Amino acid sequence: MYYTRITQIERLTDEVATLYFSISLRSYPGQFVMVYVPGCEEIPLSLSSSNSVTVKAVGETTASLINAKEGQYVGVRGAFGSAFTPSKRALIVAGGIGIAPMKYLYEYLMKCGSKVSVVYGERTAKNLFWLDKFDRITVTTEDGSFGLKGTVLDALKLEKLDEYEKIYVCGSEGMLRATYDFLKERDALDKAEFSLERYMRCGIGVCGSCVIENGLRVCADGPVFNASELPW
């Protein structure tokens, strides 16, 4: 485990913040780290760059992180897990805090000269962030307060999916499964990669707490899976 100093905290919404570390990890988009705050449980977090995580306050540890102070030290293990497969023509589909690892992926692909489009969905406009980070982006909100009213599926209906080599998906379990079903109906599932999230204890495939229905471990076999690997 590394003990790293928080060099900067960028508050993005009332519930979301990006924490920048004093170390840069050897990592690829899609991988995650285990983060430890003294007095709290160690948790997995996707990297939003080689030296940052973007966190939504949903529990004790995440609340402690977004309310941390610059200069504070936290423990970090990783990076762990599988990464997204690069492609030249890519569609990124993100729901909610699922946009966090996708920014890392987007920046990586753009440096590789790829053509990248983004679909980003939230419940309401006040939850949106990073809209200025993406050149080609379609935004959806469920209440219609910004962009297209509806979910990411409504935006996907407007996309010519056959133009993309890869479709990368990250979001809530419900969003992932709905997108999986949609892509299956459109015969586009073979080009899709999904980033899953599960409760983890070890992060290295030993404890078995993150096993999915077919026996694969999100921490060691994922968190990025080809659609064909998922039991949906």
Curated annotation (Swiss-Prot):
Keyword match Flavoprotein: yes
Question: What pathway does the UniProt record associate with this protein?
Answer: Pyrimidine metabolism; UMP biosynthesis via de novo pathway; orotate from (S)-dihydroorotate (NAD(+) route): step 1/1
Tell me which UniProt keywords the record has, alphabetically. 2Fe-2S, Electron transport, FAD, Flavoprotein, Iron, Iron-sulfur, Metal-binding, Pyrimidine biosynthesis, Transport
Q: Which CDD domains match?
A: DHOD_e_trans_like2 (cd06220)
Q: Where are the transmembrane segments?
A: none
Query: Which cofactors are named for this entry?
Result: [2Fe-2S] cluster; FAD
* Cofactor annotation comment: Binds 1 [2Fe-2S] cluster per subunit. Binds 1 FAD per subunit.
Q: What job does this protein perform? A: Responsible for channeling the electrons from the oxidation of dihydroorotate from the FMN redox center in the PyrD type B subunit to the ultimate electron acceptor NAD(+).
* Protein name in the entry: Probable dihydroorotate dehydrogenase B (NAD(+)), electron transfer subunit
Native organism taxonomy:
Archaea, Methanobacteriati, Methanobacteriota, Archaeoglobi, Archaeoglobales
